[in-house]
């Protein structure tokens, strides 16, 4: 399932979103969404119902469709969605709070493509872009073979407060996900890989002001969770809170393995390389302290050719802090060339097997 996320009025739009296969599925039936007035929810629902088995749903060019309700479009199979027009979302609606989305597409081999517009929070966005999201922009859940390509996200605060929880992409319970060729301005994770995920590749992404490229958080409340085979490469993070990161909770179970960060440029970043098994919310500190000795196992991690500069927040360039009973293992660091600030302290490697042989741990 791919969620078009919107707690109040954000929505996910993908230049090409693929569930189950590459390319655009062959579709014999075309269902053009009728323009019905101030609320086009029913017309959109009907078009998807009529074309849910091997059809193409068309949002016409130069047409604005008003969505005043929640759309859960299920049982889709081999459906193409041609977004040539504009979808305009409503403002805050309490009914959507529990779902965290205005639009959900549920099915197999569903494609979204075209050069249309989604209007969120009364702001026009084009070329499959999302602006001013009050919550996470995109979510991939219970899906396989997903391609997210050439999108633009821009959510920035108009005050000194950061736009919290505005992740660019959250992935959970999915496999074979590719996110590439995109520009992001967000207030939280540029990528957050959550539980039961295998084979994610992120490349050629520029992220501004976010929390970096993250695996986790994982293991909250003692959960048993797993992430395997993640490739993050040829990307940039500017003015980010974190650069490349793995974060797990104390007391968690499971594993994180086969993770590679390569050729990532981090400019003016607070925590360029941050790996911790001590991630915790402020209101959970007692639990975290009592379960601090164990967490998920983190192994087979390669960090190479990381360049850029550290901010003057006084954090180490490399901070790897693992648990005493579940130390991190099989780490390789090379080509870390981050320019220090005047107050940058020495790097930290705690409970990392083989740290004495890793040059970056003593830098």
Swiss-Prot record:
pH dependence, entry free text: Optimum pH is 4.0.
Major localisation: secreted
SMART domains listed in its UniProt record: PbH1
Cellular component aspect of the GO annotation: extracellular region
GO molecular function terms noted in the UniProt entry: galacturan 1,4-alpha-galacturonidase activity; polygalacturonase activity; rhamnogalacturonan alpha-L-rhamnopyranosyl-(1->4)-alpha-D-galactopyranosyluronide lyase activity
Disulfide bonds: 190-207, 322-328
Signal peptide: 1-26
InterPro entries reported in the protein's UniProt record: Glyco_hydro_28, PbH1, Pectin_lyas_fold, Pectin_lyase_fold/virulence
Thermal effects: Optimum temperature is 40 degrees Celsius.
Gene3D superfamilies per UniProt: Single-stranded right-handed beta-helix, Pectin lyase-like (2.160.20.10)
Residues modified by glycosylation: 121, 142, 150, 199, 321
Protein's UniProt keywords contain DNA repair: no
Keywords from the named record: Cell wall biogenesis/degradation, Disulfide bond, Glycoprotein, Glycosidase, Hydrolase, Repeat, Secreted, Signal
Location in the cell: Secreted
GO BP: cell wall organization; pectin catabolic process
Post-translational modification: N-glycosylated.
PANTHER family noted in UniProt: PECTIN LYASE SUPERFAMILY PROTEIN-RELATED, PTHR31736
Protein name: Exopolygalacturonase rpg13
Organism per entry: Rhizopus delemar (strain RA 99-880 / ATCC MYA-4621 / FGSC 9543 / NRRL 43880)
Recorded name of the encoding gene: rpg13
């Amino acid at each position: 399932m791919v969620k078009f996320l919107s707690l109040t009025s954000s929505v996910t739009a993908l230049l090409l979103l693929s569930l189950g296969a590459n390319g655009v599925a062959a579709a014999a039936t075309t269902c053009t969404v009728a323009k019905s007035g101030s609320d086009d929810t029913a017309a959109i629902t009907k078009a998807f119902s009529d074309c849910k088995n091997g059809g193409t749903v068309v949002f016409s060019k130069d047409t604005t469709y008003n969505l005043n309700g929640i759309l859960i479009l299920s049982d889709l199979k081999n459906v193409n969605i041609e977004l040539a027009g504009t979808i305009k979302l409503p403002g805050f609606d309490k009914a959507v709070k529990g779902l965290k989305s205005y639009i959900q597409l549920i099915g197999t081999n569903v494609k979204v493509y075209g050069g249309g517009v989604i209007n969120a929070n009364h702001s026009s966005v084009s070329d499959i872009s999302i602006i001013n999201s009050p919550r996470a922009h995109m979510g991939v859940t219970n899906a396989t073979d997903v391609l997210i390509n050439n999108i633009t996200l821009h959510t920035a605060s108009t005050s000194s407060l950061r736009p919290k929880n505005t992740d660019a992409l959250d992935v959970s319970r999915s496999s074979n996900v590719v996110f590439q060729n995109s520009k992001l301005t967000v207030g939280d994770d540029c990528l957050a890989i959550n539980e039961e995920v295998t084979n994610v590749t992120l490349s050629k992404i520029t992220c501004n002001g976010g929390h970096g490229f993250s695996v986790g958080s994982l293991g909250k409340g003692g959960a048993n969770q797993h992430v395997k085979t993640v490739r993050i490469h040829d990307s940039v993070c500017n003015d980010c809170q974190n650069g490349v990161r793995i974060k797990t909770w104390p007391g968690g179970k499971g594993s994180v393995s086969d993770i590679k960060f390569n050729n990532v440029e981090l400019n003016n970043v607070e925590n360029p390389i941050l790996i911790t098994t001590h991630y915790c919310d402020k209101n959970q500190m007692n639990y975290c302290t009592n379960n601090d000795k164990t967490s998920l196992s983190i192994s087979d991690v390669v960090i190479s050719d990381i360049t850029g500069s550290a901010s003057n927040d006084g954090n180490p360039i490399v901070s790897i802090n693992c648990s005493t009973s579940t130390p991190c293992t099989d780490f390789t660091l090379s080509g870390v060339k981050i320019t220090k600030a005047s107050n940058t302290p020495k790097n930290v490697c705690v409970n990392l097997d083989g740290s004495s042989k890793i040059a970056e741990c003593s830098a």
